[in-house]
């Protein structure tokens, strides 16, 4: 028999590791349950009714888990919370609220109830936008009222609290953090897909700023570089791959279907696929001049063999033919592998929906009234931009992005000159054409077809002045044409480079907006750091208030004389210059907020680095930065000792954040 697990025989770090593993297991089960709840909220309500028994059992289990963990997490929140415990608490609250709301909607559902009313209740379509949270923060300089609507609003507010932590009471900060936590419970608590209406990737976070601080700036300021930064930390992109044969591959493994129904569903899917493929043919593209040049080059090369001497031009043609054949001609552009345009994506979505309906009718005998079908008319009435945000079942977000890029290129490359230079093998094709012309010119005798060219090249010996002027005009026209062609090529290449650079820049924004985004770890980490900082201050105040002996000598008449004596004694002694760096670091450690802790990293940085990040992330105005820099400079004489008697840290008579921060 193995010995039972005894926590007293285990080291604290091992206990912490075991606790983290258990919390991660519970969090994973919660996320699975939340995912199933989100599916039931969107599927046919008559189908979801068959799962009401399992849903009730899971809802009771969520309540039991919440009752088991909440007491310990509440006591831990007063000391130290971690992003993991915060994520578990938010997920528990979200799972309990959404699961019970779904259960209530299913209980109210009748046999002939409208799916519209069910979806309006489960998806919250009948109520207003839930992503509006009022937050009030009371500081020593006044009250601040804000509204949280986006995820970056939460991060900005927490950074502002971190900067103003010196002028914010711990009790007021705790009240504000309760409102912030309620917003996080409705958003980050799901741990699933981020709604596009609450995410704005054009607002960089503090991690984006730190990344820019360790990369080359190329002479640009941090604010200018932040203006073009696309944040991928508050929300993170997820690459979604959709397989066209996914339904055919998974049908044989569906549980609860008889063999006859499964075979009938597979046959219906096969027939539907054949019908859609028969209607998706298109005319072949006519060959261009490049194909004719390749055929001519192939004919010349095939006519040559090892027993014939190869002219110099033929070797050049062979080399260019090698480069053209070794290139990736099938993927002239990446977008050819995806849908040609948005209409093709819509056609693909229609074919997928046709196959899905055929399978449902063959397997279940009815067409499911899912959320996207019930509100299909509303989705169809959306404009192109909103339809891109909604997405589809058969087209991945990357397909939409490639279709948009292809449409952009097709629009800008409609000019013949740009279209001629758009191919990656254009230079080789032009060189092949020139080599073929030179080869033909070398093979032709001087007296045949080249008589005209030689007559133009040779100087006019016996002709009249009219012939000289005609030859001069012809040479001038040829020179103008060559210059114009070279200028057009140069301008076209520059335009193509500008177009490619613009597409690359805009592609990053398209990917962040259209790709599936999940919640990152920035918001839980920032919330935990700020909350722990104010919780430490609260514990310090409580320990001070519970001191065994409190001597209150404020009414003693000798207190003022003692104060003057101590002040005079301190002013007579100069601080040793060798102690100034340590005192400066101690000052920064006291002034810094709880969010930035670069001084505690493995590769520790000076404490003033954290103050720099704190100031820059809140967008402090330049003149306030200059005031802060002057304050940090050493003060001469006794200016540092000027303060009112027995009022070391007070803000009487001050109002406003900036004056209060200046006094602090």
Curated annotation (Swiss-Prot):
Positions in coiled-coil regions: none
Ranges for region Disordered: 273-295, 440-466
Cited Pfam families: PRTP
UniProt-listed GO biological process terms: viral DNA genome packaging
Segments of skewed composition (Low complexity): 281-292
Chain ranges of zinc fingers (C3H1-type): 205-233
Organism domain of life: Viruses
GO molecular function: ATP binding; zinc ion binding
Keywords: ATP-binding, Host nucleus, Late protein, Metal-binding, Nucleotide-binding, Viral genome packaging, Viral release from host cell, Zinc, Zinc-finger
Keyword ATP-binding attached: yes
UniProt KW Iron-sulfur keyword: no
Location within or outside the cell: Host nucleus
GO cellular component, one term: host cell nucleus
Similarity annotation: Belongs to the herpesviridae TRM1 protein family.
Its job: Component of the molecular motor that translocates viral genomic DNA in empty capsid during DNA packaging. Forms a tripartite terminase complex together with TRM2 and TRM3 in the host cytoplasm. Once the complex reaches the host nucleus, it interacts with the capsid portal vertex. This portal forms a ring in which genomic DNA is translocated into the capsid. TRM1 carries an endonuclease activity that plays an important role for the cleavage of concatemeric viral DNA into unit length genomes.
Quaternary structure annotation from Swiss-Prot or TrEMBL: Associates with TRM2 and TRM3 to form the tripartite terminase complex. Interacts with portal protein.
The name this protein goes by in its record: Tripartite terminase subunit 1
């Amino acid at each position: 028999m193995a010995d039972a697990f005894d926590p007293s025989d285990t080291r604290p770090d091992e206990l912490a590791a075991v606790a983290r593993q258990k919390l991660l297991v519970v969090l994973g089960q919660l996320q699975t349950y939340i995912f199933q709840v989100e599916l039931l909220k969107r599927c046919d309500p008559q189908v979801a009714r068959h799962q009401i028994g399992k849903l009730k059992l899971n809802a009771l289990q969520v309540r039991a888990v919440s009752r088991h963990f909440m007491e310990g997490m509440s006591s831990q929140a007063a000391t130290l919370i971690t992003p993991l415990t915060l994520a578990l608490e938010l997920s528990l609250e979200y799972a309990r609220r959404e699961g019970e709301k779904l259960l209530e909607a299913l209980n109210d559902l009748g046999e002939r109830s409208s799916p519209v009313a069910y979806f309006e209740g489960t998806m919250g379509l009948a109520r207003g936008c839930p992503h509006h949270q009022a937050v009030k923060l009371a500081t020593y300089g006044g009250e601040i009222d804000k509204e949280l609507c986006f995820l970056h609003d939460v991060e900005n507010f927490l950074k502002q609290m971190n900067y103003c932590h010196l002028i914010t009471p711990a009790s007021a900060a705790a009240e504000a953090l309760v409102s912030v936590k309620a917003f996080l419970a409705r958003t980050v608590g799901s741990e699933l897909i981020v709604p596009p209406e609450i995410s704005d990737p054009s607002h960089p976070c503090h991690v984006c700023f730190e990344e820019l601080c360790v990369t080359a700036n190329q002479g640009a300021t941090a604010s200018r570089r932040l203006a073009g930064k696309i944040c991928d930390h508050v929300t993170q992109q997820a690459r979604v791959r959709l397989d066209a044969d996914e339904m055919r591959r998974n049908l044989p493994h569906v549980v609860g279907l008889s063999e006859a129904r499964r075979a009938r569903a597979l046959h219906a899917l096969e027939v539907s696929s054949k019908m859609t493929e028969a209607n998706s043919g298109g005319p072949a593209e006519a060959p261009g001049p490049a194909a004719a040049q390749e055929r001519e080059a192939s004919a010349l090369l095939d006519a040559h063999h090892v027993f014939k001497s190869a002219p110099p031009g033929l070797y050049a043609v062979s080399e260019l033919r090698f480069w053209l054949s070794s290139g990736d001609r099938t993927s002239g552009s990446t977008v050819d592998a995806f849908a040609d345009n948005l209409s093709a994506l819509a056609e693909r979505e229609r074919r997928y929906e046709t196959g899905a309906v055929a399978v449902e009718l063959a397997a279940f005998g009815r067409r499911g009234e899912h959320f996207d079908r019930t509100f299909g008319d509303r989705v169809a009435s959306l404009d192109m931009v909103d339809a891109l945000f909604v997405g589809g079942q058969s087209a991945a977000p990357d397909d939409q992005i490639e279709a948009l890029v292809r449409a952009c290129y097709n629009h800008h490359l409609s000019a013949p000159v740009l279209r001629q230079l758009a191919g990656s093998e254009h230079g080789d094709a032009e060189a092949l054409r020139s080599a073929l012309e030179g080869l033909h010119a070398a093979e032709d005798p001087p007296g045949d077809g080249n008589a005209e060219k030689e007559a133009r090249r040779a100087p006019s010996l016996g002709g009249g002045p009219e012939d000289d002027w005609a030859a001069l005009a012809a040479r001038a026209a040829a020179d103008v044409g060559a210059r114009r062609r070279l200028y057009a090529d140069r301008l076209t290449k520059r335009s193509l480079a500008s177009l490619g650079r613009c597409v690359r820049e805009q592609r990053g924004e398209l990917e962040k907006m259209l790709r599936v985004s999940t919640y990152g770890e920035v918001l839980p980490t920032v919330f935990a750091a700020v909350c722990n900082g104010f919780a430490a201050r609260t514990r310090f105040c409580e320990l001070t208030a519970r001191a065994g002996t409190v001597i209150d000598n404020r009414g003693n008449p000798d207190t003022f004389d003692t104060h003057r004596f101590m002040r005079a004694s301190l002013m007579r002694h100069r601080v040793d210059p060798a102690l100034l760096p340590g005192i400066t670091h101690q000052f920064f450690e006291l002034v810094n907020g709880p969010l930035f802790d670069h001084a505690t990293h493995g590769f520790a940085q000076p404490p003033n680095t954290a103050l720099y990040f704190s100031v820059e992330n809140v967008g402090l105005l330049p003149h306030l930065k200059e005031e802060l820099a002057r304050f940090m400079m050493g003060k001469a004489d006794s200016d540092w000792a000027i303060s009112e008697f027995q009022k070391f840290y007070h803000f009487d008579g001050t109002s406003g954040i900036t004056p209060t921060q200046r006094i602090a």
